[in-house]
Regions:
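A short glycine/serine-rich beta->alpha loop
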Residues: 25-29, 64-73, 103-111, 146-151
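Structural signature of FAD isoalloxazine-binding scaffolds in flavoprotein oxidoreductases
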Residues: 29-48
Length: 172
């Protein structure tokens, strides 16, 4: 019935290039990043899988039990970490959701696809649950997920640019 009406929430996270200062943001140095138009989009909807979430892209399909939600050592960790950290922050049990991921952002070549993935997922969760996460909270949470859960070491520049960047203006 009405419980499974297809409510779709979308989040988008952008990639970036860094004009100067690569590897300096996590050492306290100056950087000059620029958001690019390439992005990762997370479409989030309710599913009928009790106590599970499903994650899909054009090359990936996985259904995960909420009871056993833990690191998988693949790119799904960005979504899993987002579910766990977002759920903890807002006291929400994340379940019965489908995450459909699409991307125009090449992965693994230094354009901050990890930040874009985490940001897009958190934005979709924020929209779906109608929470009031500020941009600063989103940036901090995405940073914590990448560093504490996924294990991607780095500074906060990538998350900052993905959320607050402008494709026509570098950030200093």
């Amino acid at each position: 019935g009405d419980v499974y009406k297809r409510q779709v929430s979308v989040g988008e996270g952008y990639g970036r290039v860094n004009l100067i200062g690569e590897h300096l943001d996590y050492n306290g140095g100056c950087v000059l990043p620029l958001q690019i138009k390439n992005s990762i989009i997370c479409e989030l909807s309710k599913n009928r899988e009790i106590d599970c979430i499903s994650i899909a892209s054009d090359k990936y399909q996985k259904t995960l039990s909420i009871e056993k939600l833990k690191k998988t050592d693949d790119w799904a960790d960005f979504i899993i970490g987002s579910c766990l950290f977002f759920g903890e922050k807002y006291s929400i049990i994340i379940k019965e959701l489908s995450f459909n991921i699409s991307s125009t952002l090449p992965l693994g070549i230094g354009l901050s696809s990890s930040a874009a993935m985490t940001v897009s997922t958190l934005k979709a969760l924020n929209n779906f649950y109608k929470t009031t996460m500020s941009d600063d909270e989103l940036i901090d949470l995405a940073y914590d997920i990448e560093n504490s859960f996924v294990g991607v070491g780095g500074g906060i520049m990538d998350q900052f640019v993905s959320v607050l960047g402008n494709q026509n203006q570098a950030l200093y």
